[in-house]
Amino acid sequence: MTDIILKADHLKKVFISGKKSMTAVDDVSFELKQGECLGIVGESGSGKSTIAKMITHLESITEGQVFLKGKDITNARGKDLRETYQDIQMVFQMPMESFDPRCTLGDGIGESLRNMGISRTETRKRVENLLERCGLDSEYADRYPHQVSGGQCQRVAIARALAVSPEI
């Protein structure tokens, strides 16, 4: 299993509201090997985003397990969860909604770097470099989400995901 970097095993997600329940994901399994690309395809509302959110711990898992490099991360907490975030990043469909409107885009990109203990000066350098790699001028670091277009915000979201050099 050394070349498998991500494994989802019989994932299930049930949302409960009062006495009603709705199964969003039912028995999904897959493996992602080093160097592979994986596409999850389906109709609107079929559970694609929910699967990604379960893998990244943004949504709880009702049943099943997730393994990262052979380690069960299904119930990861604290330090283990922070390490997981360094290996797996997600770019949201609606990037504008994933940024704090009170913070600059540079703050949003640099948050994970600062959480890793990187100095503000070094964080700023990395943020500017990431923006340029994603086709935006470094001055976008000082803008707020409402000051950029949807496409520009998507590029900023990609820069944020790349900030910690994730494997996935």
Q: How would you describe each model-predicted region?
A:
Residues 2-5, 14-27, 77-80, 102, ...:
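A short, flexible loop at the N-terminus of ABC-type nucleotide-binding domains that lies
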Residues 41-43:
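The feature captures the beta-strand-to-loop junction immediately N-terminal to the Walker
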Residues 56:
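Helix-to-loop junction immediately C-terminal to a conserved catalytic motif
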Residues 64-72, 84:
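Conserved ABC transporter NBD signature motif
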Residues 144-148, 152:
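Conserved ABC ATPase signature
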Residues 158:
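Hydrophobic anchor residue at the start of the ABC signature
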